[in-house]
Regions:
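NAD(P)+-binding Rossmann beta1-loop-alpha1 motif at the extreme N-terminus of oxidoreductases
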Residues: 1-67, 92, 128
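Hydrophobic beta-strand scaffold residues
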Residues: 30, 50, 118-120, 161, ...
Length: 304
């Protein structure tokens, strides 16, 4: 297995910062960039190197990790005027951890292969806590050479690494399925909490009972405490699920596969975004149900 020493990392957002920090903790030299310069001091204080462009992060790098919002940003990071591929050595591995459509990922894999690079389609799950603790799950696909090159990085960022196939895009298929379930679970948790509260049960009691009952889920246990506290500081924003469930529906259209539950969950997130909640934590969808029903799930209730 080749030894990786210098890593370029693009995207120090809520999850990206934790992921990049885990690489530092595991002995990698990480040069990073983010569009938000306010993260620069914290990154440098943690031992990371700061760059002004994706191209600069890739100079002398053995690999680059991309953790940005969408496929448009991935394209800009890799192929833009100051894109990473202007500096990245041929034969290096490109790891895209962003949530993108399977068809996009498949096309990107072909494009990178033709340009002389290895590619790992490696979306992640586990939230901010998982990123900060190095306990993410990674659902990755790519050729043997890409896995051999990228595995040390994956192991630094995750405790569960699933190799789901050799074809680029299969990792994104699994992430798409995960996001279908995650989005539906969040909206159902919000609906259920508002429903039970409106019917007269103390929301804290309701959460305690359901979290230890068959109707619970990982998302219920993780997001309902945010709802109860009225703390909608974004760990994963409403707008993220507008995008991700949109990808789910796009894949369904490509396959001619009906996705009625995903479509309904998507519309709830769209409604939340339209109500001005897009930048808030995805658990803020509970506000829609509170406003519709008069229920007060949150200890500090507000309309927006």
């Amino acid at each position: 297995m080749p030894e990786l020493k210098k890593i370029g990392f693009v995207g120090l957002g809520a999850m990206g910062f934790g992921m990049a920090s885990q690489l530092l903790k595991n002995g990698f030299h990480v040069a990073a960039v983010d569009t938000r310069s306010e993260v620069k001091p914290r990154w440098i204080d943690g031992g990371g190197a700061w760059c002004d462009s994706p191209s600069a992060t890739a100079i002398d790098a053995d690999a680059i990790v991309v953790m940005v919002v969408n496929s448009e940003q991935v394209d800009a990071v890799l192929f833009g005027g100051n894109g990473a591929l202007k500096s990245l050595r041929k034969g290096s591995v490109v790891i895209v951890a962003s949530t993108v459509s399977p068809s996009y990922s498949k096309g990107l894999g072909k494009q990178l292969s033709e340009a002389g690079y290895l590619y790992l389609d490696a979306p992640v799950s586990g939230g901010v806590v998982g990123a900060e603790s190095g306990s993410l799950s990674i659902m990755a696909s790519g050729c043997d050479a890409a896995f051999e090159a990228g595995e040390p990085l994956l192991r630094a960022m995750a405790t569960k690494i699933y190799r789901v196939g050799a074809e680029a895009g299969l990792g994104s298929v699994v992430k798409t399925v995960n996001q279908l379930l995650a989005g539906a679970h969040i909206t159902l948790a919000a609906e259920a909490m508002a429903f039970g509260t409106r019917a007269g049960v103390d929301p804290n009691v309701l959460y305690e009972v359901i979290s230890h009952s068959a109707g619970s889920s990982w998302m219920f246990n993780d997001r309902v405490p945010h709802m109860l506290a009225g703390d909608f500081t974004p760990r994963s924003a409403v707008n993220i699920f507008v995008k991700d469930l949109g990808i789910v529906l796009d894949v369904g259209q490509e396959l001619k596969f009906p996705l009625p539950m995903a479509a309904l969950a998507h519309q709830i997130f769209v409604a939340a975004a339209a109500a001005g909640l897009g930048a808030q934590d995805d658990s803020a969808v509970v506000k829609l149900f509170q406003n519709l029903s008069g229920a007060s799930v949150s200890q500090t209730r507000s309309e927006r």
